[in-house]
Amino acid sequence: MNKVNQASLTAPLAVPAFRSLWSASIVSNIGAMMQAVGAAWLMTSLTESTLLVGLVQTAATMPVFLVGLVGGAMADLADRKKLLFWSQVWMLVMAALLGILTLGHFTTPAVLLGLTFAIGLGRAIGLPAWQASVQDIVPKPLVASAVSLNSIAFNAARAVGPALGGLLVAATGAAFAFFANAASFLAVLFAVNAWKPEKAPAPRLGEDIFGAIRSGFRYLLHAPRLQAPIIRATMFGLCAAAVWSLLPLLARDVLHTNATGYGVLLGAFGAGSIVAGTFLPRLRNRFALEGILALGTALAAVAFFALSFCRQPWPAGVSLFFAGMAWVGVLVNFNVAVQTSVPDWVRGRALAFYLLAFQGALAISGALWGWLAGVIGISQSFAVAAVGLILSLAFSKFFPLESDEEIDLSPSPAWPELHADLVADPDDGPVLVTIIYDIAEEDASNFRALMRIMRERRLRDGARRWRLYHDAKDPERFLELFRLDSWGEHLLQHQRTTMEDRELEAKVLSLHRGKERPLATHYFGDDE
């Protein structure tokens, strides 16, 4: 990917809607961190079971796996502003209810886990809508800086929130940490309510949630440009997430520090994350994206190697500072790559796939690195993770990130009407579409190459099967054939067309020798 002039880090803050939503997200993220501290501490006072204490974190994160894709589909089908608003209302009510029950001493382990899970549901539904809304709020040139600012907001909250939560719980009890979290959602509600989208949500033909999830999977299967950042972020996460599993063990058993020292080490990681976020726009102006990703991955590997030799807290803190820089430097760019590689109609689902894959990598790595530390040792496990990070660089060869600077993924103007006189129900089907091309022999090779790309586009946007044929008697006559489940799916296929797709169509048509457009015919399945 070529380097391109990027907006400064603070440029998105000049957009009033983004500025207010970003500020509100800081408040909300701090509230979420305080909630996590309060829930974990309350569970330790309700039970001596280490399993139940561990299940608090599971209850908070499991909704991403269960309904994350539903949230992504809803972000694409529904009004994102309304979805954001009502997901915040849901979380506010659940957090306030938990605070009230705790204040009245009615909270049991089951109640705590249930309401923690309920709050997680709201987050799993709202997060894809929030991330997909970035391009609805700021122009495309500001997206990378906006994502960097969101990362800074999260890491700043992660650095401050647990400390504030601990102080509040110690002073007033866990109930008030839950009330603080509930109050933090008010900031987001006010910001969302004040946001006036410049353009109304694009009208979408009827599609249910499960149909949208299926079409999202189909898009992912036939979109290498989306697969690449998801696969590479997953591989990076499997190795880099070793820090979350191994750091508590390193602090306790190798550095021999206490909880305060562990908090300082986490703070060093968070500080590095914030610093990296401020420098990313400058790096993007100077280096190509692949270069930044390679630099960040190598920096993480060096930091992990250093941690494998650390026996004192201060050098470990320095190493974690650079590890935090690498973490944000790599993941922000993968997030930007996902957001800018897909059109608006599927962006929520694309981000849901990304979040699901990355969270899955974190979950797997937790067990993997914990097990490995018990087998070969903590320091040695950091060294293995460093080697894994270096090896993960090889994935850039097999899954390169394509340049998005010249790609126009905006919706295409409407195609020519599909048989305006045809009376068909959206559920009618299956539908078979045939298109006949007249291609000169000397252009056949170029035509076939373009049609291989066309195949992926057709399958990605709704077709079930696709095939290209040539006439046995007239080798310059080609037949494109693809099948869809219903007439409604074919209408959706047209609605999903982007300007990039139209450019491909124009290249194909330039090889067609006929004076008229290639003849397209639509057939409906007939069981009689």
Say what each PLM segment does:
Residues 66, 81-83, 97, 109, ...:
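C-terminal transmembrane bundle of multi-pass solute transporters/carriers
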Residues 17-37, 60-94, 111-170, 185, ...:
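Substrate-agnostic recognition of the 12-TM MFS/MFS-like secondary transporter fold
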Residues 455-479:
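Short, glycine- and small/hydrophobic-rich beta-strand elements in well-ordered beta-sheets
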Residues 4-62, 218, 222-267:
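Helix-loop boundary and gating motifs at the non-cytosolic
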Residues 40-47, 98-104, 160-180, 253-255, ...:
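Transmembrane alpha-helix termini and helix-breaking/packing motifs in multi-pass membrane transporters
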Residues 14, 45, 76-77, 105, ...:
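Membrane-helix boundary and inter-helical linker elements of multi-pass secondary transporters
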Residues 402-405, 458-465, 483-519:
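An amphipathic, aromatic/His-enriched active-site/gating alpha helix that lines ligand/cofactor pockets
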Residues 132, 136, 178-208, 286, ...:
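Helix-loop junctions on the cytosolic side of multi-pass membrane transporters
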